[in-house]
């Protein structure tokens, strides 16, 4: 299936980006990527990821840890996804994460008429996998 306007949203806190270029190349074969955003706490162990993402044309969104081990990355990604859905006419959303918290978002996007592709680790939850139209291991 080919798409005209693809949104790529990366949960950098919960994603291995060792194959970022291959991931982007694959998504590009599916259509035109018009939005690239990545979310995470870049001040800690994600500094190298931030640089790689920026070099690949991603807008990097920074969220501090409010309490140890927790930040607003997930909710920020979800808010942006819903905001983008209602402001523009995108036909596909790509969510790169292994976090099952994105299951309700993937279902909401599907119910709103867009095609949802998930990318994540092989141990990503069945709920998130099944919430997407398709899911690929990275």
Where on the chain are the PLM-derived regions?
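Short hydrophobic alpha-helical runs that function as membrane-insertion/retention elements
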Residues: 60-62, 94, 117-118, 136-137
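Acidic beta-strand-to-loop metal/phosphate-binding motif
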Residues: 39, 91-98, 105, 109, ...
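Receiver (REC) domain switch/active-site residues of two-component response regulators
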Residues: 133
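Class I SAM-dependent methyltransferase SAM-binding "motif I" and its flanking Rossmann-like core
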Residues: 128, 137-138
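A short acidic, glycine/proline-enriched capping/turn motif at secondary-structure boundaries
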Residues: 84, 100-102
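Short beta->alpha linker loops
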Residues: 72, 97-100, 120-123
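Domain-level signal for Mg2+-assisted phosphodiester chemistry and nucleotide/NA-binding surfaces
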Residues: 1-86, 107-110, 115, 123, ...
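General alpha-helical segment detector with a strong preference for membrane-spanning helices
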Residues: 15-17, 103, 137
């Amino acid at each position: 299936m080919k798409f005209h306007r693809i949104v790529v949203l990366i949960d950098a806190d919960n994603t291995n980006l060792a194959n970022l270029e291959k991931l982007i190349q694959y998504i590009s074969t599916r259509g035109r990527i018009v939005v690239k955003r990545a979310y995470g706490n870049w001040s800690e162990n994600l500094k190298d990821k931030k640089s790689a993402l920026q070099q690949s044309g991603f807008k990097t969104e920074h969220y501090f840890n409010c309490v140890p081990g927790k930040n607003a990355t997930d909710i920020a990604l979800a808010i942006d996804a819903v905001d983008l859905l209602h402001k523009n006419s995108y036909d596909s959303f790509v969510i790169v994460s292994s976090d099952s918290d994105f299951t309700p978002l993937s279902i909401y996007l599907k119910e709103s008429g867009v095609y949802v592709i998930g990318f994540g680790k092989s141990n990503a939850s069945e709920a998130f996998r099944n919430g997407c139209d398709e899911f690929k291991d990275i």
